[in-house]
Amino acid sequence: HMGLGQPDFKTPKHVVEAAKKALDDGHHGYVMSNGIPECRQAVTRWIKKRYDVEVDFERILIMPGGKPTMSYAIQCFGEPGAEIIHPTPAFPIYESMINYTGSTSVPYDLTEDKDLKFNADKILSLITDKTRLLILINPNNPTGSFVEKPEIDKLAEGLKKHPHVTILSDEIYSRQI
């Protein structure tokens, strides 16, 4: 199945109840543009628990979903003359936003003979002086494939030679491995 990641389960009851309570408590107006402080603080606690990294909640930005997040990030780095490396097949917003910015789309193919996984050497070979952004997604959407740590480490080591490249790591399904 190579479709979009449409949830096939109900929203958890505690999430539904929290949304109802927020509405009942009168929270139906605009919030701070970077997100509700308590929510941002909760994200810092989650990051600490998951990655053992301290992050100031002032550096956290709450977004209304994956699509606008990807769109804004690609717009930040994309411009005519820039190259953006991205997987294919992948979430359609990547290539459409790259084209919107006037950047050059540089796909790295995820093929069945490689179990739909990226190859670090192939990605590194695509980097030029014009590369501004490298989009990674693991596990991949829509293939469901995921890349093992040794290959990720190999890519990370190779990227040290390219400090001009920013990594956009789409981790929407990372907790499902």
Language model region names:
Residues 76-98:
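Conserved PLP-anchoring active-site segment centered on the Schiff-base-forming lysine
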Residues 100-105:
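A short helix-loop-beta submotif of the ANL/AMP-binding
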Residues 6-7, 67, 91, 138-142:
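Short glycine-rich anion-binding loops that position phosphate/pyrophosphate groups of nucleotides
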Residues 65-71, 88-89, 150, 177:
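Short N-terminal helix/helix-N-cap motif within the alpha/beta-hydrolase-1
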Residues 54-60, 80-83, 130:
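Short acidic capping loops at alpha-helix termini that bridge into adjacent secondary structure
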Residues 106, 112-177:
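Active-site phosphate-binding strand-loop segment of PLP-dependent enzymes
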Residues 1-65, 72:
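N-terminal small-domain helix-loop-helix segment of the aminotransferase-like
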